[in-house]
């Protein structure tokens, strides 16, 4: 059951937002890489619709995969995957390189957001980590990737 003061809103984030200024206390978005045409406009609209002292939270996953022991080369399967997404994003004008190009921080600052906090988290893929929590994350990410590959 949702709290009485909670509503979920859905709209096309590429358009002018339908809500008036100072509407929301909290805006949460995630995984919009490859979806937004104009990141600066997106952040301006979020800032405009957020109440003074409101909170905006945006989570994104980078596509610039790395390996602690090396081994991800441009011709490897993962390297080709990253290259294909980078090229596709350029062709449609909707980048997948939001994290790698620093678009979140740049866009939020330009829109007027203050007190920005950026967290870059390590996200393993597979069961290789020895840390139990990272191992669990790695197994979940493996399932997410395998489940989503068909749709990509």
Specify the residue positions occupied by each region the protein language model found.
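Beta-strand-rich binding-surface signature
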Residues: 5, 21-24, 53-55
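Conserved SAM-binding strand-loop segment of SAM-dependent methyltransferases
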Residues: 4-15
């Amino acid at each position: 059951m949702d709290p009485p003061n909670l509503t979920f809103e859905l709209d096309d984030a590429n358009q002018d937002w339908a809500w008036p200024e100072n509407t929301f206390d909290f805006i949460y978005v995630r995984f919009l890489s490859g979806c937004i045409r104009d990141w600066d406009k997106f952040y301006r609209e979020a800032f405009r619709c957020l109440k003074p002292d409101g909170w905006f939270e945006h989570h994104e996953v980078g596509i610039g995969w790395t390996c602690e022991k090396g081994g991800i080369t441009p011709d490897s399967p993962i390297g080709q995957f990253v290259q294909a997404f980078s090229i596709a994003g350029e062709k449609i004008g909707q980048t997948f390189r939001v994290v790698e190009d620093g678009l979140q921080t740049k866009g939020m600052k330009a829109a007027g957001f203050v007190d920005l906090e950026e967290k870059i988290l390590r996200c393993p893929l597979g069961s290789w980590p020895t840390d139990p929590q990272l191992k669990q994350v790695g197994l979940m990410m493996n399932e997410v990737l395998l489940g989503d590959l068909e749709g990509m």
